[in-house]
Amino acid sequence: MGAEAVRVLVVDDSPVDRRVVELLLRAHCGGGGGAAAGEAAPFHVTAVDSGKKAMELLGRRRGDRDHLTPSSPAAAAAANDQAIDIVLTDYCMPEMTGYDLLKAIKALGSPNPIPVVVMSSENEPQRISRCLTAGAEDFILKPLKMNDVQRLRKCSGATRPKSAVAGDDDRCCNTAKKAAAAAAATPEQQQQQQRSSHLAGLAMVMNASSFEVSHYFQLIFKLILLAYAVLCLSQLLHRWSNGSSLLSLWCA
């Protein structure tokens, strides 16, 4: 029997980054890494472009669950469908940053707090430490890779057992060690890492959206052919009109 879907709320103001994350998570459906081989839970992705919209969505779903009758099996199923298992948010966003969203979610005071994972294209140790201290489950560098999806799956409240909670401290310690190692890196090394991340992100966009890109190229090519055909037709009409004028003068 397949595992239950992991409901992920993706928060990013960049439409390209949102699309990349959606494609990556959906491509990982049914992959390995679950409790048993071939039984990894698929991802159900909901994407918004701001922290404000994320809080509105979480508040609305929380309010809907509060109005349901707990004793009703149908109500329990509906509440389960509305739940969000994990929030994956970008750090740099206008108005409400990923750090602000993290604090706002933690301030909801839910008995079962939603795990929050922060992502960023900038490898800044102070930023990583700040988010982990505020309660982030993990901090992932963009662009996301397949092993990052595995980390996201382990952080989600829907798939990790209670016995795995004890391992959170070890995970956070490992992330903190990575942050310390990044702090020890020279500015040139950090710039090289950022350039590599940007190039990898571009490659991921091209690979994940190959169908969309090829479709756009075909459309552009057809438009160019159409424009060329119209140009040739106009030239022929122009020459024909000039020829008709000369013929009329010669006949006169």
Curated annotation (Swiss-Prot):
One of its GO terms (biological process) is cytokinin-activated signaling pathway. Keywords: Cytokinin signaling pathway, Cytoplasm, Nucleus, Phosphoprotein, Transcription, Transcription regulation, Two-component regulatory system. It comes from the Eukaryota. InterPro entries: ARR-like, CheY-like_superfamily, Sig_transdc_resp-reg_receiver. Residues 7-157 form the Response regulatory domain. Two-component system major event consists of a His-to-Asp phosphorelay between a sensor histidine kinase (HK) and a response regulator (RR). In plants, the His-to-Asp phosphorelay involves an additional intermediate named Histidine-containing phosphotransfer protein (HPt). This multistep phosphorelay consists of a His-Asp-His-Asp sequential transfer of a phosphate group between first a His and an Asp of the HK protein, followed by the transfer to a conserved His of the HPt protein and finally the transfer to an Asp in the receiver domain of the RR protein. Its main location: cytoplasm. Induction: By cytokinin in roots and shoots. GO terms for cellular component: cytosol; nucleus. PROSITE patterns: RESPONSE_REGULATORY (PS50110). The modification 4-aspartylphosphate is found at residue 90. It is found in: Cytoplasm, Cytosol; Nucleus. Gene3D superfamilies: 3.40.50.2300. Belongs to the ARR family. Type-A subfamily. Functions as a response regulator involved in His-to-Asp phosphorelay signal transduction system. Phosphorylation of the Asp residue in the receiver domain activates the ability of the protein to promote the transcription of target genes. Type-A response regulators seem to act as negative regulators of the cytokinin signaling. This is Two-component response regulator ORR2.
